[in-house]
């Protein structure tokens, strides 16, 4: 298990997510807002490319391509002097860790990737074995927030007394990479601890808490009815628990709940009383960030105005 004391707050490359940029850009701006107020040393590098995540998991990209793109991104991080890759997306997190391990342990893959770089004149991208460590160079942004939880308490301008908030810890964080989870991978509490620091009342356990969001990448498109039934099962459990706010750490999970909650309500004739945020959006909001200019709530499908009015934000 990963120790919270091992999480760096210096030389972080904030790894941009294509799903964040496309669907919820407020997650990135909220993360930057929070990091700035916590004194985190980070950079965003426009030379970084997509991790291939969804393409990889839907068999559009095979492993060698994903490894080559990861090697390129690792070179970008090292060259700019910010080698601690910090992901906004749990898929980016797992992909980068897997690719790093593959490049370090599989000589054939590493040599093939490097031969392609050299052939095309990109010698500066060549990956040397163990030049990156999947356990000490690749993190999730929620881990950085957790490591700064006491500082977060000091920066709070709005708290959320009595707000029942539930967490959804992404599968690609605590299931796929369970050996690197902070705390118990069978009952992760990272988001809950941060939410509590912001004044919310976390529902630390509810029925179906460890159930996947239902997206499954290709499953949403190939088996949509099954995918949405899984999502509905989770939403039903949250509704029974009286949850007002569901907090996420991955844009893919966020899409599944926020974009498809209205679809499920229409198709199944049900109604849910909860809204959705990424943990960085929630922390930024509690620090006084503008709900639209910083948090980007206008991009959400489930309207947040009722929640924001109830809590006195607007």
Swiss-Prot record:
Gene expressing this chain: hdrB1
Species annotation: Methanosarcina acetivorans (strain ATCC 35395 / DSM 2834 / JCM 12185 / C2A)
Required co-factor(s) are: [4Fe-4S] cluster
Q: Subunit details for this protein?
A: The ferredoxin:CoB-CoM heterodisulfide reductase is composed of three subunits; HdrA1, HdrB1 and HdrC1.
Details of cofactor binding: Binds 1 [4Fe-4S] cluster.
State what this protein does: Part of a complex that catalyzes the reversible reduction of CoM-S-S-CoB to the thiol-coenzymes H-S-CoM (coenzyme M) and H-S-CoB (coenzyme B). Probably involved in methylotrophic methanogenesis but not in aceticlastic methanogenesis.
Q: What happens when the gene is disrupted?
A: Triple hdrA1C1B1 deletion decreases methane production from methanol, but does not affect methanogenesis from acetate. Deletion results in up-regulation of CoB-SH and CoM-SH synthesis and transport, and methylsulfide methyltransferases.
**Entry EC no(s):** 1.8.7.3
Keywords carried by this UniProt record: 4Fe-4S, Cytoplasm, Iron, Iron-sulfur, Metal-binding, Methanogenesis, Oxidoreductase
Q: GO MF annotations for this entry?
A: 4 iron, 4 sulfur cluster binding; metal ion binding; oxidoreductase activity
GO terms for biological process, alphabetical: methanogenesis
Annotated pathway: Cofactor metabolism; coenzyme M-coenzyme B heterodisulfide reduction; coenzyme B and coenzyme M from coenzyme M-coenzyme B heterodisulfide: step 1/1
> Which catalytic reaction applies to this protein?
coenzyme B + coenzyme M + 2 oxidized [2Fe-2S]-[ferredoxin] = coenzyme M-coenzyme B heterodisulfide + 2 reduced [2Fe-2S]-[ferredoxin] + 2 H(+)
Q: Does the keyword 4Fe-4S apply?
A: yes
Q: Where in the cell is it found?
A: Cytoplasm
Q: What is this protein called?
A: Ferredoxin:CoB-CoM heterodisulfide reductase subunit B
């Amino acid at each position: 298990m990963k120790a919270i004391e091992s999480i760096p707050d210096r030389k972080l490359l904030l790894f941009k997510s294509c799903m964040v940029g496309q669907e919820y850009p407020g997650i990135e701006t909220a993360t930057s807002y929070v990091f700035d107020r916590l004194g985190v040393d980070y950079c965003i590098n426009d030379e970084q490319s997509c991790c291939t995540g969804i393409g990889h998991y839907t068999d559009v990209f095979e492993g060698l391509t994903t490894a080559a793109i990861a090697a390129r991104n690792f070179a970008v991080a090292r060259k700019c002097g910010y080698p601690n890759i910090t992901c906004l997306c749990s898929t980016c997190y797992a992909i980068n860790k897997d690719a790093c391990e593959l490049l370090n342990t599989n000589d054939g893959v590493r040599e093939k990737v490097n031969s392609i770089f050299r052939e095309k004149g990109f010698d500066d991208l060549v990956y040397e074995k163990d030049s990156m460590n999947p356990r000490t160079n690749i993190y999730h942004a929620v881990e950085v927030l957790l490591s700064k939880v006491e500082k977060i308490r000091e920066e709070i301008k709005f708290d959320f007394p009595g707000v029942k908030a539930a967490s959804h810890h992404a599968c690609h964080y605590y299931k796929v990479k369970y050996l690197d989870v902070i705390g118990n991978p069978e009952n992760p509490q990272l988001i809950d601890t941060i939410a509590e620091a912001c004044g919310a009342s976390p529902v630390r356990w509810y029925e179906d808490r460890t159930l996947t969001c239902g997206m499954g990448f290709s499953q949403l498109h190939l088996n949509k009815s099954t995918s949405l039934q899984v999502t509905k099962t989770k939403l039903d459990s949250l509704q029974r628990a009286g949850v007002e706010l569901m907090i996420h750490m991955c844009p893919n999970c966020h899409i599944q709940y926020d974009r498809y909650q209205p679809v499920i309500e229409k198709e199944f004739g049900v109604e849910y009383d909860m809204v959705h945020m990424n943990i960085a959006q929630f922390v930024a909001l509690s620090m006084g960030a503008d709900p639209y200019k910083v948090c980007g709530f206008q991009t959400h499908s489930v309207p947040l105005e009722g929640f924001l009015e109830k809590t006195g934000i607007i």
